[in-house]
Amino acid sequence: MITIQMLTDLYNAYVDTFRGADGNLPPMMELKRIHTAQVVANARLIAEGEGFDAETARACDAAALLHDTGRYEQLKRYNTFRDSDSVDHAVFSHDIVKEKGWLDGDPQREAILTAVLVHNRRDVPDGLDPLTEAAVHTVRDADKLDIFRVLENQIATTDWRHDCTAFWNLPTTACPSPAVLAAIREERPVDYQDIKTLADFVLIQVGWMRSGLHYATSRRISAERGHLAFRRNFLHELTDDPVVDELCDFQISACAGA
């Protein structure tokens, strides 16, 4: 069985192939490198909080490390991270890891690869074995927790009112879309095709805090980091629609781990 350190070394060596002559990654790739490190850290917190055994924690750790492996080649080829304009990055990541053979002969190979493959799907497949299911849910939760951080950082460090590139160039002053509001109220995943405004983009993350975070540990971490309060305040900058407080209040019990 390959150690996590050995797998990390292989991953880092692969990422290094995208560095320029100055030794630096392109800025958007560097963001993904940092994101991956944060997802790994989140996965470890979840595994500890949920009391996973060493075998399960190891599969979660490996899957978190590898979940976005394809992002670097995606940006190089297509100059975008938007899957609808390029490739499904989870499938791409799965295929690259498989092609590299990093997990060949590893008894957790299929569990880790499956977690990479489905980490961005709207729904988790049925019929997963316990190890795979734990890896899948942990990576999905850990990824969302860092996506919360990334959004907050983008809002704090960019002129989002005039350059909304990081948010798919969505309108910044339009009200939330009815389809998005309905999905959040019904506690079901939002269809990304229904995201029409920046308010929608932020509200889907509000919805995640109740129906998108699988583990109580993940919901506790989200609450401790103040992610819901940040989104409530930011949404008030985007719209005066009272639905903002309605939906944020709806999440509070779940974010507290209820």
Where in the sequence are the language-model features?
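Divalent metal-dependent phosphate-bond-processing catalytic cores, especially two-metal-ion Mg2+/Mn2+ enzymes
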Residues: I2, M28-R33, A37, A41, ...
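An amphipathic alpha-helix signature
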Residues: T8-N12, V40, H94, K98, ...
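Active-site flanking loop/helix segments enriched in acidic
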Residues: Y11-Q38, Y72-D83
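Amphipathic, well-packed alpha-helical segments that form the structural scaffold of globular domains
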Residues: R19, A41-R44, G70, K98, ...
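His-Asp-centered metal-binding catalytic motifs of divalent-metal-dependent phosphohydrolases/nucleases
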Residues: A57-R82, S93, A111-R122
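Post-HEXXH active-site segment of zinc metalloproteases
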Residues: K76-V91, T157-R161
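Sequence-structural signature of the catalytic-core scaffold of metal-dependent phosphohydrolases
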Residues: V87, E110-N120, L131, V150
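A generic, well-ordered mixed alpha/beta core segment in the N-terminal half of proteins
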Residues: D88, F92-W102, V116
